[in-house]
């Protein structure tokens, strides 16, 4: 098991003597690292396990390794709550009252958490605009995010909220202000998926923006859960924050930038 969240490759080879050789690591695609004199590069760790009791036992061993050594202890053993998510019930068409009505129904159904999905922020009335503008849409939620959270809490449930931090729409205030923050090839039409581009998570200023904007929302209401989405793969892997001879490092630096972005929300008080 490779301890890495980006593109990876595994090879298994058995030679004429019956010896099995396993190689696991970063994929050769989109990876070329310029290592200068005196610098170091650390490859991702690999976790190995062995059993002669079949795949089920091997899977259980990996589960135990991850639970006991990788999962943050403060979250590892907490009760996983039964939740209701509004997405397929409303898509982008909702307001305060509709979400509160759904919360009431969720309580009656025995749910323990309500998660407000995509569409609560920016000019987000469909999937063509607003992504990246992490500010509550007060035209939809006139009572504010805190009113919804308080209503859900009053029912004895927890409240969760949807984010997709790594993504941005061209039709957004963020992209209009910082088009260079998106991964795009100079001089080429960008490849879109779900009408969105991918932010360049290798850039510290992008991480700082995401932390500040999302933290402001999290501080505005009692939010107990984050649904962190990722609705497209990387393409046009080119960073305007790196020189031409270091573009092979972008995909790897993207992953390295994403890790602290996630940890900021759990290790620091918002």
What are these regions (language model features)?
Residues 1-66:
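N-terminal accessory beta-strand-rich subdomains and adjacent acidic, glycine-rich linkers
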Residues 22, 85-101, 193-209:
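Active-site mouth loops of central-metabolism enzymes
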Residues 61-113:
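An acidic-aromatic substrate-binding cleft motif
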Residues 73-78, 122-123, 183-190:
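Flexible hinge/switch segments at interdomain interfaces of large molecular machines
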Residues 76-81, 112-123, 162-165, 225-236:
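Core alpha/beta catalytic barrel or barrel-like domain that forms the active/cofactor pocket
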Residues 78-82, 110-112, 153-159, 222-224, ...:
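Short, well-ordered coil/turn segments that N-cap beta-strands
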Residues 90-176, 183, 208-209, 254-264:
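Aromatic- and glycine-enriched glycan-recognition loops and surfaces
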Residues 137-154, 175-270:
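Active-site neighborhood of glycoside hydrolase catalytic domains
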